[in-house]
């Protein structure tokens, strides 16, 4: 059974929810934002370091994004993605600015989602 606890950071996606390319999915306890099929952002309100905004990108794009948003840092567990803790005093404004970058289809943000692994079918009737 799924969790009934609502993610308090869903408001971060409000400005792009009407975009025809937008889709939201649950992802490992986070809510993820996809735009045009690319995984772009994820929000979660758990314990640090799972308490804020994840910017889905590749390591080769980190420096450029951090130049624009110095408050972003590589996530301590998922180092390929950038992270902004919701405890940051400017979280709301920064999250809004990052979402605007996604809305503009900035090529620095967004990764192809990993293909699902097919589970081996078990023959239960042998």
Regions found by a protein language model. Name each.
Residues 2-39:
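N-terminal first-folded block
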Residues 58-119:
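Short, structured beta-strand-loop surface elements
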Residues 123-126:
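Catalytic cores of nucleic-acid ligases and guanylyltransferases
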Residues 26-29, 34-77:
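Short, conserved beta-strand/beta-arch hydrophobic-aromatic motifs that form part
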């Amino acid at each position: 059974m799924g969790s009934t606890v609502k993610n308090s950071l869903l408001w971060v996606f409000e400005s792009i929810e009407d975009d025809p390319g937008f889709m939201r999915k649950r992802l490992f306890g986070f809510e993820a934002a996809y735009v045009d099929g690319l995984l772009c952002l994820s929000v979660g309100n758990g314990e640090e370091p799972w308490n804020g905004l994840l910017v889905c990108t590749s390591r080769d794009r980190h420096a450029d994004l951090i130049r624009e948003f110095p408050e972003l840092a590589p996530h301590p567990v998922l180092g390929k993605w950038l992270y902004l803790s919701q405890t940051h005093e400017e979280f709301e404004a920064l999250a809004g600015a990052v979402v605007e970058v996604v809305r503009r289809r900035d090529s620095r943000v967004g990764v192809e989602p990993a293909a699902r692994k097919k589970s081996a079918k078990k023959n239960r009737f042998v």
